[in-house]
């Protein structure tokens, strides 16, 4: 596992341990690796707690030490059973609240349901609902990393520190890709162009954007929004007044804006979940002359058959951080590499507990990062 160690953080962390308790809210032992790394860096023991499933599938949490008047940090990494993971977190937060903890800080590197942060047809903004549930349960502060949309911070009425993994990924590129100077940073869609531009400017590299093969817009005829007005109201509508309709989208021919011929292509994004779009992008880049293809992302969900598809694809290497456990996927696909980000989470915990400024962790970060 690749681990970045900035010189400023190499010294032993100076932390007041008396009023700090560190819990892992995961009942799944495979999800506790990140918690153990953070505890080791801070030089503290993990708090004593039992999180398990009853025979009737209910979640039970039993805190086995006093948290009265203490700063409680609850680390929750998201497992494949995301809904159970959320309940584990909410129940533990509420248990700490009713046990008179001074503050309850959630350390959730990957915020679940972050893709559902926009209203779509008759759906709902689920990430707003989840934020409200966490605050209601008793969370007083949130530490997370690379939210899918930065505006999600506004869903909370508590402080949110949205840390960035890009410094770790940038250093991986510089140290693990020997000829990275001959690389070009690629956005697999115009939506991820800002992130790609940020990487390209920091590495002094060129940028390419893949455009085309857009999905068809959802039909309003399907969900009933194109329904005609009720018969009673038809007579009230003047014949000359007709509401203009939005022109439907069409798939444009796929285009790569930028030169990738004879270059290393580094595709950057925040989440790798369904890999179909990454595979299509890799094939396109190969056709345009790229001789090596890397994919870099913060969160490696790698759902379903993602490891097998990556192994059989034109992608040479997929680099993700350990915000989400993916050891099983790495066994299935040797192309998957991991960057450890426990250092920045540990430093955030230390600074919050000691009442220090967090601005150090956001140096040189712009609005588009």
UniProtKB/Swiss-Prot annotation:
Entry's family note: Belongs to the ribose-phosphate pyrophosphokinase family.
Organism: Mus musculus (Mouse)
Hydrolase as UniProt keyword: no
UniProt superkingdom: Eukaryota
Pfam family of the protein (one): Pribosyltran_N
Name of encoding gene: Prpsap2
Entry protein name: Phosphoribosyl pyrophosphate synthase-associated protein 2
InterPro entries: Pribosyltran_N, PRibTrfase_dom, PRTase-like, Rib-P_diPkinase
GO function term, MF aspect, one: magnesium ion binding
Keywords: Acetylation, Nucleotide biosynthesis, Phosphoprotein
């Amino acid at each position: 596992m690749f681990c970045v160690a900035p010189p400023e953080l190499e010294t032993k962390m100076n932390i007041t341990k008396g009023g700090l308790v560190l819990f892992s809210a995961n009942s799944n032992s495979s999800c506790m690796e990140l918690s153990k790394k953070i505890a080791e860096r801070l030089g503290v023991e993990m708090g004593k707690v039992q999180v398990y499933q009853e025979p009737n599938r209910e979640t039970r949490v039993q805190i086995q030490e006093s948290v009265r008047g203490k700063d409680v940090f609850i680390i929750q990494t998201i497992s494949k059973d995301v809904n159970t993971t959320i309940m584990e977190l909410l129940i533990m937060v509420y248990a700490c609240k009713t046990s008179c903890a001074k503050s309850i800080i959630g350390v959730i590197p990957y915020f679940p349901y972050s893709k559902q942060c926009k209203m779509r047809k008759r759906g709902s903004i689920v990430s707003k609902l989840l934020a409200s549930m966490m605050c209601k349960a008793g969370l007083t502060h949130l530490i997370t990393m690379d939210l899918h949309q930065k505006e999600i911070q506004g869903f909370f009425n508590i402080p949110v520190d949205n840390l960035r993994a890009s410094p770790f990924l940038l250093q991986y590129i510089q140290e693990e890709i020997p000829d990275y100077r001959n690389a070009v940073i690629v956005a697999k869609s115009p939506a991820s162009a800002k992130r790609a531009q940020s990487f390209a400017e920091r590495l002094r590299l060129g940028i390419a954007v893949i455009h085309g093969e857009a999905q068809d817009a959802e039909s309003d005829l399907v969900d009933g929004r194109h329904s005609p007005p009720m018969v009673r109201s038809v007579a009230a509508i003047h014949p000359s007044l007709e509401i203009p309709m939005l022109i439907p989208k069409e798939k444009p021919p796929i285009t790569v804006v930028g030169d990738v011929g004879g270059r290393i292509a580094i595709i950057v994004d925040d989440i790798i979940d369904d890999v179909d779009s990454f595979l299509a992008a890799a094939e396109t880049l190969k056709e345009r002359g790229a001789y090596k293809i890397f994919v870099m992302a913060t969160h490696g969900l790698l759902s379903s058959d993602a490891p097998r598809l990556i192994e059989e694809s034109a992608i040479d290497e997929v680099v993700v951080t350990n915000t989400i456990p993916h050891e099983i996927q790495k066994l299935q696909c040797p192309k998957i590499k991991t960057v450890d980000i426990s250092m920045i989470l540990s430093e955030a915990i230390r600074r919050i507990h000691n009442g220090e400024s967090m601005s150090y962790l956001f140096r040189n970060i712009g609005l588009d990062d």
